[in-house]
């Protein structure tokens, strides 16, 4: 997060820096937790954050499980964050620079947990959006299915899975698929998520896979093959309409999260509210990007060697 006039245009952006979070997305998880309280469970011990970079959700998890928890027994608690991009260290968090679709990543997570299953898995990952909503929604659902495959292998029965989604035309397909694995599916929209965005979060409560299904992560296995035997692979969009039963579509409960007194994520605040820190100057970023794709371009620009096409 950089220094700019965005501090005034987006108060969640500013508040994140004031409170030491690396990104404004931290407030999305906090507001989801205010509604569902999945991080307030005293028995929550093993947590996985997928697609975690730059690490704001991992920061929330660290503070909830270690800094703010009233429990004195915190030795057994573990947080593992996974991302293809490198992440700067976070207290109480083990970071893995790894691919969530690879079996070796699964093995590394289970080893860190002592071969115990996770209580909670979350994913705030999203692809680089193109502006083509149908394409963005499709790619995002593929990312969710990849996260779900890993989650199915590491989440304990009764556990919770939270992931970012893009609400589009066929999102009820995803609701139906997740309904085969979880007792309750809720689509939640935090106040800190811009109302103009298709972004929302799927909250899956009570992991309850079929008793005769054993998930196995394999790089050579397709999504359909992975979910073979748990009925989820029955639901797919086919060009042949006769293969699709409209009655199988589910409508998930929709819930807005966050207090009505919260800031409007779509509003521009020219005068900072009194609840925001007194200074109106721009704040330094909490954590600079570790290896941004634009790093070389910045170096060339600062040295005056960046050429412009005519």
Curated annotation (Swiss-Prot):
Region entry Required for interaction with RTT10/TRM734, spans: 233-259
Q: Please state what is observed when this gene is inactivated.
A: Leads to abnormal 2'-O-methylation and decreases charging of tRNA(Phe(GAA)) and tRNA(Leu(UAA)), resulting in translational defects and GCN2-dependent activation of the general amino acid control (GAAC) response. Increases cellular ROS (reactive oxygen species) levels. Sensitive to oxidative stress induced by hydrogen peroxide, rotenone, and acetic acid. Increases RNA level of TRM7, TRM13 and TRM44. Decreases cell population growth; the effect is suppressed by knockout of GCN2, GCN4 or MAF1.
- Name a biological process GO annotation: wobble position ribose methylation
State the protein's name. Answer: tRNA (cytidine(32)/guanosine(34)-2'-O)-methyltransferase
**Domain of life assignment:** Eukaryota
Q: According to the UniProt record, where is the region Interacts with RTT10/TRM734?
A: 129-254
Recorded catalytic reaction(s): these are: cytidine(32)/guanosine(34) in tRNA + 2 S-adenosyl-L-methionine = 2'-O-methylcytidine(32)/2'-O-methylguanosine(34) in tRNA + 2 S-adenosyl-L-homocysteine + 2 H(+)
SUPFAM superfamilies listed in its UniProt record: S-adenosyl-L-methionine-dependent methyltransferases
List the source organism. Answer: Saccharomyces cerevisiae (strain ATCC 204508 / S288c)
Q: Signal peptide span per the entry?
A: none
């Amino acid at each position: 997060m950089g220094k700019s006039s965005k501090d005034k245009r987006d108060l969640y952006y500013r508040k994140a820096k004031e409170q030491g979070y690396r990104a404004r997305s931290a407030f999305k998880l906090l507001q989801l937790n205010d509604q569902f309280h999945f991080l307030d469970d005293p028995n929550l011990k093993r947590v996985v954050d997928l697609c975690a970079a730059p690490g704001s959700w991992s920061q929330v998890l660290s503070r909830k499980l270690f800094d703010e928890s009233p429990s004195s027994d915190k030795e057994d608690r573990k947080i593992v964050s996974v991302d293809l991009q490198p992440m700067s260290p976070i207290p109480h968090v083990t970071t893995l620079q790894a691919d969530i679709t690879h079996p070796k990543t699964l093995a590394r997570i289970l080893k860190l947990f002592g071969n115990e299953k996770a209580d909670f898995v979350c994913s705030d990952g999203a692809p680089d959006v193109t502006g083509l909503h149908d394409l963005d929604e499709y790619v995002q659902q593929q990312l969710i299915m990849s996260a779900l495959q890993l989650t199915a292998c590491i989440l304990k029965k009764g556990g919770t899975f939270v992931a970012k989604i893009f609400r589009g035309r066929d999102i009820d397909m995803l609701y139906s698929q997740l309904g085969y694995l979880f007792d309750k599916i809720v689509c939640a929209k935090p106040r800190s998520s811009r109302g103009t965005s298709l972004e929302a979060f799927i909250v899956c409560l009570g992991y309850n896979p079929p008793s005769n299904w054993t998930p196995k992560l394999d790089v050579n296995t397709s999504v359909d093959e992975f979910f073979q035997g748990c009925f989820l692979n029955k639901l797919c969009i086919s060009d042949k309409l006769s293969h699709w039963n409209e009655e199988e579509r589910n409508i998930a409960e929709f819930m807005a999260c966050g207090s009505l007194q919260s800031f409007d994520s779509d509003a521009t605040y020219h005068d900072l509210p009194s609840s925001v820190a007194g200074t109106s100057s721009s704040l330094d970023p909490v954590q600079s990007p570790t290896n941004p794709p634009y790093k070389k371009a910045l170096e060339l620009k600062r040295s005056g060697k960046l050429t412009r096409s005519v």
